[in-house]
Design a protein with these regions (language model features):
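ASCE RecA-like P-loop NTPase motor cores
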Residues: 1-236
Length: 236
């Protein structure tokens, strides 16, 4: 269907948004054997790229057609936070290299100076290469002091410049990016709810369940506080 629509609307952005799981096993508990089975999944990187392309197109263009499955009804974070946290790099606007790096970390890009994969960035002197999860090729940003001298799309293997830009937004590496005040409020709310539920479990002599819930929640809260993200964040 998406391919047909691209033929009918060659000048529009026709994008594809479906579930990115190749395999998904929800968490489960077998009381007979007291066995806890953690959630397990495998994500299709190509489909994940298409999902990010759909999001980026919706926020940057008006001529967008989205082909989606029912998975699009599930919440994936705030559009306002997703758009508001994305740095818009413009040659005419002063920007320090270190400030740009901090902005990338805030929107959940991982630094990897050896293997530039989607969702990562690398730093070599005044040059920052970013590989957005929605892009076919990485972006290169060259700085001189607080000036952005070059914004270009490059070949990930040869480093050859493919296209140059005057300005470009860098959209987040995850749909679940959230402003820090909201994260702090969520941490407080989750902690309070956990305490209440743990007390209920202990009151009914379900000590093992209470310990497991407390341990898992504490781990997730620590990840949210330090990284801004945790596995299973959609459950919160």
């Amino acid at each position: 269907l998406a391919s047909e629509l691209k033929e009918f609307f060659p000048n529009n952005s026709v994008v594809y948004f479906v579930s990115y799981y190749d395999y998904y096993q929800p968490e489960a508990y077998v009381p007979q054997s007291d066995t806890y089975i953690e959630k397990d999944s495998s994500i299709n990187e190509e489909v994940e790229m298409l999902r990010h392309q759909a999001t980026a197109s919706l926020l940057s263009r008006r001529d967008v057609i989205v082909v989606a499955s029912v998975s699009c009804i599930y919440g994936i974070g705030s559009p306002e936070d997703y758009a508001g946290l994305a740095p818009n790099v413009d040659k005419k606007v002063p920007l320090e290299r270190d400030d740009f790096i901090h902005a990338l970390i805030d929107i959940q890009y991982d630094r990897n100076d050896y293997d530039l994969a989607r969702g990562t960035f690398r730093v070599r002197g005044d040059v920052v290469d970013v590989y957005p999860p929605y892009a076919e090729h990485p972006l290169r940003f060259e700085f001189f002091g607080d000036e952005v001298e070059l914004i270009a799309e490059i070949d990930e293997v040869t480093g050859e410049m493919l296209r140059e830009y005057e300005a470009i937004p860098v959209w987040p590496a995850s749909h679940y990016v959230t402003e820090k005040p909201k994260v702090k409020a969520a941490l407080k709310s989750i902690s309070e709810e956990c305490e209440k539920r743990v007390a209920e479990l202990k009151a009914t002599d379900k000590l093992l369940e209470a310990q497991r819930l407390q341990q898992r929640t504490d781990y997730d809260l620590e990840m949210l506080e330090t990284m801004g993200f945790c596995n299973g964040i959609e459950n919160y």
